[in-house]
C-alpha cells in the first residue's frame, strides 16, 4: 500500500534519468574534443559550479568536452523563432509586484507569446532576472506537446537502490510555435503522468494544470487505484523529494514552476560547460499521424551500468557531452512558506534560455544539492519546426552523498495537436480502468 508521503512526492513528479562520458561505440568524437578529469580539473575552473568541480577534482566525474559552432548551435532553434524574438522587442513589460508578464499596449497578461519576450537583457535592469526567467519559461514550450516513457533511478555508492518507471505527456499553450486552436481552461501548460513500475506505484496517475494568471498556484490531482478517486495536492510539493529519491519535481528543466513563484535577480555572468546530447539537432521522424513525430535519443548510460567505472556510480559515461556556453547566473527564491528550497542559483544560457545547472540551498541558507539538466534539440526535415527537450536530470545531494537520475528515455514523441480532453479529471481516472 502506498504511504501518503510516497503519494505526495509522486504527485510532485508530474509537474513534470571505463569510464568517461563518451559517445556510443562506433560514433567518433568531433575534432578538438577533450576529456576533463581529475588529472586536468584546473581547465574547468570558473566553467563549472563549485560543487561539480570539486567532484571532478576528486575523481567522481569525467566529462567529454566538445568544441561548438555557436551559430550552428543557435540554429537548433528555427529562423522564425529568432525573427519573432527580435520583433518582440518593446512589446512586453512586467508587473512589478508579481513578475507577471503583460503586453505593453494593453497592460494585460497575454495568452500567447512566440519567441523571447525580452530579446535584449541589460544586467543593470532591476527586472533583468525576471525577464531572463520569462525567456526561459516560454522557450520550454516551443515544442507544443510531447511525451516519453522514462525512469527515475536512486543511486548511492553501492549502485542503484530504487527504480521507478513512468510516462509523462505534456501540452503547452503560452509559448508554443503555433497558437493552439482551443484552450478552454485558460492554461499555460498541463501534464498527465502514469506510473508503470514498481508494483506499489503502478496505476498512480497525476494531472497538473498551470493557469494563465499571475497569482494562482498550479492545480494538481493524484489518482490512486486503491482509493479509486482523485485527490487535490498542494503545488508546494514540487520541492519535496520524489519517492524518497534525491530528485525533485522542480528539477524538470531545472525549474518547473511559474515564473511568478520566485523572486529573480541576476547575480553574475560567465561561461559554463553545459550538458547536452548532440550538440546539434536530432531528426524528427514522421509517423502515421501528421501531427506526431518521433525522436530517437542516444541512451545516457550511468556509471553503475558501466563495467569498470571508477567514478561516482551516478556519473554519465556515454552520449553526454559538455559545450561551453555564455550564461546569466541568476538567483531565485520562493516566497511560499511551504516550499522547502531557499536560495537557488541557476546558470541560464544567454541565447538558448536553457538552465544547465542549479545549486540549491535550504531555507536556513545552507547549500545541499546540485542538479545537472541535460537537453537535446530536434528539427523537422525542412527546418520549419524545432524544439528543445530535457532528457535527463542528475540530482546530487552533497550532504548525503547520494544521487538520482531522472529521464534517460530512448525515444520521445512530439505532438502538435493534443486533444485537451486527454488532460482532464475524467482522463485521469480512466487511465487505470
Where are these regions (language model features)?
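Short, hydrophobic/aromatic-rich segments at coil-to-beta transitions
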Residues: 186-192, 218, 323-331, 354-358
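Hydrophobic helical h-region of N-terminal Sec-dependent signal peptides
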Residues: 11-16
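Non-transmembrane domains of secretory- and envelope-associated proteins
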Residues: 25-119, 227, 237-317, 324-326, ...
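Solvent-exposed N-terminal domain segments of exported/luminal and surface proteins
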Residues: 25-218, 224
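Sec/Tat signal peptide C-region and signal peptidase I cleavage site
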Residues: 18-24
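Extended serine/threonine-enriched, polar tracts that run as long, contiguous segments within proteins
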Residues: 321-322, 326-338, 342-352, 361
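Short, surface-exposed coil-to-beta transition loops
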Residues: 202-205, 216-217, 339-344, 356, ...
Amino acid at each position: 500500500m502506498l504511504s501518503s508521503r510516497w503519494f505526495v512526492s509522486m504527485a510532485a513528479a508530474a509537474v513534470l534519468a571505463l569510464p568517461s562520458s563518451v559517445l556510443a561505440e562506433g560514433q567518433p568524437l568531433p575534432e578538438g574534443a577533450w576529456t576533463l578529469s581529475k588529472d586536468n580539473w584546473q581547465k574547468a575552473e570558473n566553467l563549472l559550479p563549485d560543487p561539480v568541480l570539486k567532484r571532478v577534482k576528486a575523481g567522481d566525474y569525467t566529462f567529454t568536452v566538445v568544441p561548438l559552432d555557436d551559430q550552428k548551435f543557435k540554429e537548433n532553434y528555427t529562423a522564425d523563432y529568432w525573427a519573432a524574438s527580435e520583433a518582440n522587442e518593446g512589446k512586453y513589460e512586467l508587473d512589478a509586484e508579481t513578475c507577471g508578464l503583460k503586453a505593453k499596449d494593453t497592460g494585460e497578461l497575454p495568452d500567447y507569446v512566440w519567441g523571447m519576450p525580452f530579446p535584449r537583457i541589460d544586467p543593470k535592469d532591476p527586472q533583468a532576472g525576471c525577464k531572463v526567467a520569462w525567456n526561459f519559461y516560454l522557450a520550454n514550450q516551443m515544442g507544443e506537446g510531447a511525451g516519453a516513457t522514462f525512469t527515475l533511478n536512486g543511486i548511492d555508492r553501492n549502485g542503484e537502490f530504487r527504480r521507478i518507471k513512468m510516462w509523462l505527456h505534456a501540452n503547452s499553450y503560452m509559448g508554443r510555435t503555433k497558437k493552439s486552436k482551443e484552450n478552454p481552461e485558460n492554461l499555460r501548460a498541463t501534464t498527465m503522468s502514469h506510473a508503470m513500475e514498481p508494483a506499489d506505484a503502478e496505476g498512480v496517475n497525476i494531472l497538473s494544470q498551470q493557469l494563465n494568471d499571475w497569482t494562482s498556484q498550479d492545480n494538481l490531482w493524484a489518482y490512486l487505484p486503491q482509493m479509486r478517486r482523485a485527490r487535490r495536492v498542494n503545488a508546494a510539493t514540487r520541492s519535496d523529494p520524489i519517492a524518497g529519491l534525491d530528485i525533485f519535481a522542480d528539477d524538470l528543466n531545472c525549474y518547473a514552476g511559474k515564473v511568478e513563484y520566485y523572486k529573480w535577480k541576476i547575480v553574475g555572468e560567465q561561461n559554463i560547460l553545459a550538458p547536452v546530447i548532440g550538440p546539434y539537432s536530432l531528426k524528427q521522424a514522421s509517423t502515421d499521424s501528421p501531427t506526431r513525430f518521433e525522436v530517437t535519443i542516444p541512451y545516457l548510460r550511468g556509471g553503475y551500468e558501466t563495467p569498470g567505472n571508477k567514478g561516482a556510480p551516478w556519473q554519465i559515461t556515454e552520449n553526454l557531452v559538455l559545450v561551453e556556453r555564455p550564461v546569466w547566473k541568476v538567483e531565485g527564491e520562493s516566497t511560499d512558506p511551504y516550499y522547502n528550497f531557499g536560495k537557488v542559483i541557476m546558470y541560464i544560457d544567454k541565447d538558448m534560455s536553457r538552465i544547465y545547472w542549479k545549486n540549491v540551498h535550504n531555507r536556513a541558507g545552507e547549500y545541499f544539492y546540485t542538479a545537472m539538466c541535460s537537453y537535446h534539440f530536434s528539427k523537422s526535415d525542412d527546418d520549419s519546426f524545432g524544439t528543445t527537450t530535457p532528457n535527463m536530470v542528475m540530482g546530487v545531494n552533497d550532504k548525503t552523498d547520494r544521487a538520482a537520475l531522472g529521464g534517460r528515455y530512448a525515444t520521445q514523441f512530439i505532438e502538435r495537436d493534443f486533444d485537451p480532453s486527454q488532460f482532464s479529471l475524467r482522463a485521469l481516472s480512466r487511465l487505470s480502468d
